[in-house]
Amino acid sequence: MCIRDSTSLGIPHFAGISLNQIPGDPDSIKGSKVRGVYWTKPDSTGKEVSRDVAIEEEKYTEFVKDFEHTYFKEVYDVLSKRYKLGRMRLLLKEPRSTLSWHRDPEPRLHIPIYTNPGAIMVVDKVAQHMPADGSVWITNNTKYHNAFNGGEENRVHLVACVLDYKFN
């Protein structure tokens, strides 16, 4: 099982477990490849900079063997019949923490697994709590966004990159 904690990912209070990988390439779920490329405006100049490495999302087609006989595989199979998916990960946001204001290359599909009322996602300055009620959310992560957990319990989402979803 490939669990990456906040230390190995380089982001405080964040952890990820990759559920699929590039076929035959266990390194495709390690280090910065759990995060992937994103863009941010880190200072008062407002100049956008790129962080991390580009990911070839369309190559992530093999489910990690440790998770083949789990409900996550069933969910992956159902969703991949409807959407073209890239990486699918379990992402943890620890209590009282936030990500940077950033944007990603593609939309994301979220299924909240464990959450609390203080766990909020802000996309293009619109805040939304996603309850863990079995709903599937698709967020436009190509717009600037962040996720924060202002609660006192962990937030865990099943998150997949969606390669063929177009917003109006």
What are these regions (language model features)?
Residues M1-S6:
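Conserved small/polar residues in nucleotide/adenosyl-binding loops
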Residues T7-L92:
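Signature of the catalytic double-stranded beta-helix
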Residues L92, R103-A119:
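Short, conserved beta-strand element in jelly-roll/cupin
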Residues E94-R96, D133:
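Tight coil/turn sites that cap or link beta-strands
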Residues L99-H102, A119-M121, M130, T139-G151:
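Short beta-strand His + acidic residue motifs that chelate non-heme Fe in jelly-roll/DSBH
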Residues P112-A132:
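A short beta-strand-loop-beta hairpin characteristic of the jelly-roll/cupin
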